[in-house]
Amino acid sequence: MPGGISIHVYDVSRGVPAAGLRVELRGPDGKLLVDAQTAKPGTLEGPTPLTGAYEAVFHVGDWYRAQGVALPTPAFLEVVPYRFGIADLAQHYHLPLKMTPWGFSLFRGGA
C-alpha cells in the first residue's frame, strides 16, 4: 500500500479492536484534516499526506466510558496526542495504537 496514512487502534486490556474511537488528524499547517471514528476493526484511513509534521489525537477517555469501563475522575488518560513527521510521500505511514485506560504504545507500523 504505497503512500498515505492509516491508523489501527487496539484495546490490549480487553483484547478488542477500538471500534468507534474518535480520532482527529491535523496537517502540517495545523488544519483539521480528519475528525472521525475508527471502523469496526479499529481502523481509520487518513488522507494522502504532504511532507511535514502531523498530529493525531486519540480520545481514549470518552471511548472507555462509552464501553462501560469505570474510570477515575479525572481519568488517567483522557486524550493521547501523537506528533509524527512525514518525509517520503512514496512510503505508507501506519500508526498502530495499543492502549489500556492506564497506558499506551504508539509506533510506526509496517502495514
Predicted regions and their residues:
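Compositionally biased low-complexity segments at domain edges in trafficked proteins
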Residues: 87-111
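Beta-strand-dominated extracellular/periplasmic modules and repeats
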Residues: 1-88, 94-96
